[in-house]
From Swiss-Prot:
Positions bearing Phosphotyrosine: 275
SUBUNIT field: Homodimer.
Keywords: Acetylation, Calcium, Isopeptide bond, Magnesium, Metal-binding, Phosphoprotein, Thiamine pyrophosphate, Transferase, Ubl conjugation
Protein name stated in the entry: Transketolase
Superkingdom field: Eukaryota
Species of origin: Rattus norvegicus
Chain residues that bind substrate: 37, 258, 318, 345, 416, 424, 474
Annotated binding of Mg(2+), by residue: 155, 185, 187
Known catalytic reactions: D-sedoheptulose 7-phosphate + D-glyceraldehyde 3-phosphate = aldehydo-D-ribose 5-phosphate + D-xylulose 5-phosphate
Keyword Ubl conjugation: yes
Length: 623
């Protein structure tokens, strides 16, 4: 076989010994913790031994080195064996393994990036392969480097549709630097996996997605060495037939042992049995990588020129997003764009036109698109911007949630928000997205109201840690800011004010423009309103909101193209709660909408200029 050199018997025995030490460590750690998944670890022991101590190239004492091969443990519940590997490699003290799952230890129940050897958090199953695809795409097309990417999946998680989205992606883009290892141990959490040990069916499925699929005995280190040596020329799936709980007498291949540690007495006996098979304590040193990944700096990426808009001209913020992203792409070759086959609606096609080699078409697979972005962003190799209709990000909420747990720096732009998209109807209208993104830990939620603000939001997002969401709209609205207006995260703007203002009206996007129109109407009736643009919904500018409220007799009116739950009104209410004399009145979409013209829908749901006028009058009349 091309490029394959069979290890000698001494090396094969050393790999067997390593696998058994990994088993012992996994059993010891989970028994000490009183929880965990030792049987899921034991099925993967030979796979992990061969991967880390024969196949992969990495610096054991520098796990995040950019030249290293990457590994993603998609079956994150097998974390103890991952920790055991890094102790075997010399990065972790072996005694630390016994602190598994303790609050004082970094060794959580599932992998998290506070561990230097973990790039992405896993444990919500079906997501690791998508992240691995992002890493492999980056390695092949952006870094053009030698490092390879390995991902181990359990057979239970292969029921997840997101796995097959990732399989399709890897096949389409011919990610020949990617290897997925399927640990086919037959048993799921509560029942056998649907295909049990039908490894030929797994092989056909993988081949249908454009993968080279190799069936192996997952407990044969020799077969595994050979299979990894054959992983060339296209994405490769190693379909490893294994047994859950391998090496644990009385438990191997038995149901009802998922997620259960061995009782102490049983563990001691089993450890003695396994240890009796270990012929040498000598450890195998990791093989260092080829150092050919380029140096990358993604800090302080700034627009090459200021915005170029004219006050009063009209542009949709979704188009302004595309223009801004294309411009930012000239500032750094590490700005990349991903889209879910909506690029002619989100206007990310403008980026593709100017930077075709940095645009990733993810097709209609939003869950995988987010995972790809997370993978691309690992080790600070790229700054990804994903775009689709904001409504369609809701199906990727688990991926977004896990991205936050992964401490990932990704930017998501959701277009076509609210009822203002008009005739397409409720399936296309994002009305829950603010609630969703506000709930994500350490997220930043941008809601720009004109082209200038949108361009600034894109630039700020590129330099803001965590999950950034930019909410853009379909209707064209007037430019209201000058090109030199300064924008910052958490800094709102007073767009209109006078000394006699009686109500503070807070709107964003389409509703900010409705508020300005309402202000003109109210002015004719000698009722002054202060109009505030929050710019970021998270974090909100609490100080400015309260200053405006106090200047307008404590009256705040929020108006938003979003459902009441979780939107601007609730966000504003949260920051003013407990403030004496401040009240918040909310206008929002109250029920599932329908098709219609944008103006008709804004009126129907009481968030247009007329509704604002009536609400302001009601507040003023109340006194």
């Amino acid at each position: 076989m091309e490029g394959y050199h069979k290890p000698d018997q001494q090396k094969l025995q050393a790999l067997k010994d390593t696998a058994n030490r990994l088993r012992i460590s996994s059993i010891q750690a989970t028994t000490a913790a009183g929880s965990g998944h030792p049987t899921s670890c034991c099925s993967a022991a030979e796979i992990m031994a061969v991967l880390f101590f024969h196949t992969m190239r990495y610096k054991a004492l520098d796990p995040r080195n950019p030249h290293n091969d990457r590994f993603v443990l998609s079956k994150g519940h097998a974390a103890p064996i991952l920790y055991a590997v890094w102790a075997e490699a010399g990065f972790l003290p072996e005694a630390e393994l016994l602190n598994l799952r303790k609050i004082s230890s970094d060794l959580d129940g599932h992998p998290v990036p506070k561990q230097a050897f973990t790039d992405v958090a896993t444990g919500s199953l079906g997501q690791g392969l998508g992240a691995a695809c992002g890493m492999a795409y980056t390695g092949k097309y952006f870094d053009k480097a030698s490092y390879r990417v390995y991902c181990m999946l359990g057979d239970g998680e292969v029921s997840e549709g997101s796995v097959w989205e990732a399989m399709a992606f890897a096949g389409i883009y011919k990610l020949d630097n990617l290897v997925a290892i399927f640990d086919i141990n037959r048993l799921g959490q509560s029942d056998p996996a649907p295909l049990q040990h039908q490894v030929d069916v797994y092989q056909k499925r993988c081949e249908a997605f454009g993968w080279h699929a190799i069936i192996v005995d997952g407990h044969s280190v020799e077969e595994l060495c050979k299979a990894f040596g054959q992983a060339k020329h296209q994405p490769t799936a190693i379909i490893a037939k294994t047994f859950k709980g391998r090496g644990i007498t009385g438990i191997e291949d038995k149901e009802a042992w998922h997620g259960k540690p061995l009782p102490k007495n049983m563990a001691e006996q089993i450890i003695q049995e396994i240890y009796s098979q270990v012929q040498s304590k000598k450890k195998i040193l990791a093989t260092p990588p080829q150092e050919d990944a380029p140096s990358v700096d993604i800090a302080n990426i700034r627009m090459p020129t200021p915005p170029n808009y004219k006050v009063g001209d009209k542009i949709a913020t979704r188009k302004a997003y595309g223009l801004a992203l294309a411009k930012l792409g000239h500032a750094s070759d590490r700005i990349i764009a991903l889209d879910g086959d909506t690029k002619n609606s989100t206007f990310s096609e403008l980026f593709k036109k100017e930077h075709p080699d940095r645009f990733i078409e993810c097709y209609i697979a939003e869950q995988n698109m987010v995972s790809i972005a997370v993978g691309c962003a690992t080790r600070d190799r790229t700054v990804p911007f994903c775009s689709t209709f904001a409504a369609f990000f809701t199906r990727a909420f688990d991926q977004i949630r896990m991205a936050a747990i992964s401490e990932s720096n990704i930017n998501l732009c959701g277009s076509h928000c609210g009822v203002s998209i008009g005739e397409d109807g409720p399936s296309q209208m994002a009305l829950e997205d603010l609630a969703m993104f506000r709930s994500v830990p350490m997220s930043t939620v941008f809601y720009p109201s004109d082209g200038v603000a949108t361009e600034k939001a894109v630039e700020l997002a590129a330099n803001t840690k965590g999950i950034c969401f930019i909410r853009t709209s379909r209707p064209e609205n007037a430019i209201i800011y000058s090109n030199n207006e300064d924008f910052q995260v958490g800094q709102a703007k007073v767009v209109l004010k006078s000394k006699d203002d009686q109500v503070t009206v807070i709107g964003a996007g389409v509703t900010l423009h409705e508020a300005l129109a309402a202000a003109e109407m109210l002015k004719k009736e000698k009722i002054g309103v202060r109009v505030l643009d929050p710019f970021t919904i998270k974090p909100l500018d609490k100080k400015l909101i309260l200053d405006c409220a106090r200047a307008t007799k404590g009256r705040i009116l929020t108006v938003e193209d979003h459902y009441y739950e979780g939107g601007i009104g609730e966000a504003v209410s949260a920051v003013v709660v407990g403030e004496p004399g401040v009240t918040v009145t909310r206008l929002a979409v109250s029920q599932v909408p329908r098709s219609g013209k944008p103006a008709e829908l804004l009126k129907m749901f009481g968030i247009d200029k007329d509704a604002i006028v009536q609400a302001v009058k009601g507040l003023v009349t109340k006194g």
